[in-house]
UniProtKB/Swiss-Prot annotation:
Protein's recorded name: Flavodoxin 2
Induction remarks: Is the predominant flavodoxin expressed when A.vinelandii is grown on N(2) as nitrogen source. Is also synthesized during growth on nitrate, but in less abundance than AvFld 1.
Cited InterPro entries: Flavdoxin-like (IPR001094), Flavodoxin (IPR050619), Flavodoxin/NO_synth (IPR008254), Flavodoxin_CS (IPR001226), Flavodoxin_lc (IPR010086), Flavoprotein-like_sf (IPR029039)
A Pfam cross-reference name: Flavodoxin_1
Function recorded in the entry: Flavodoxins are low-potential electron donors to a number of redox enzymes. NifF is the electron donor to nitrogenase, and is thus implicated in nitrogen fixation. Does not function as an electron donor to nitrite reductase.
Domain Flavodoxin-like: 4-173
UniProt binding sites for FMN: 10-15, 57, 61, 99, 106-108, 155
Originating species: Azotobacter vinelandii
SUPFAM superfamilies: Flavoproteins (SSF52218)
Length: 180
């Protein structure tokens, strides 16, 4: 079994694309395939000691799911399935996609929601990211002046995505016992 579980929720496929680009940097012994949370069980998810989780922020700051007009279930429906799990001793890194120009008042709020969910259940959250280079009004994903995970804006800053992903993975690798 792979050491790191890589899971995402997606509506348009952008978060899936980023998850797959993360996976390409690791072999199968190190990281699972990029797995959509609408296709896994709580047991699949819970078996990993290390997790990398991705989400877009939809509409007015929502997680993807049926109530935010997604065609398929996503994080909104998956989180209740794992809310009884204890994540103490697990290390979690988060990445989020959002549109800082179109939705500056709730940029990456869904990332903040994932952060709170896993932190409240004992997970060690790693991979905070600087807010430098972003222009937004507010975000639930900012704690102590930094994003709680990798912040990506494929709508307005797609040219920075590969560089940001590489730098973030280098930052979190030691937390997962890896070297890049």
């Amino acid at each position: 079994m792979a050491k790191i579980g890589l899971f995402f929720g997606s509506n348009t496929g952008k978060t899936r694309k980023v998850a797959k680009s993360i996976k390409k940097r690791f072999d199968d012994e190190t990281m699972s395939d990029a797995l959509n949370v609408n296709r896994v069980s709580a047991e699949d998810f819970a078996q990993y000691q290390f997790l990398i989780l991705g989400t877009p922020t939809l509409g007015e700051g929502e997680l993807p799911g049926l109530s935010s007009d997604c065609e398929n279930e996503s994080w909104e429906e998956f989180l209740p399935k794992i809310e009884g799990l204890d994540f103490s001793g697990k290390t979690v890194a988060l990445f989020g996609l959002g549109d800082q120009v179109g939705y500056p008042e709730n940029y990456l709020d869904a990332l903040g929601e994932l952060y709170s969910f896993f932190k409240d259940r004992g997970a060690k959250i790693v991979g905070s990211w600087s807010t430098d280079g972003y222009e937004f009004e507010s975000s639930e994903a900012v704690v102590d002046g930094k994003f709680v995970g990798l912040a990506l804006d494929l709508d307005n800053q797609s040219g920075k995505t590969d560089e940001r992903v590489a730098a973030w993975l280098a930052q979190i690798a030691p937390e997962f016992g890896l070297s890049l």
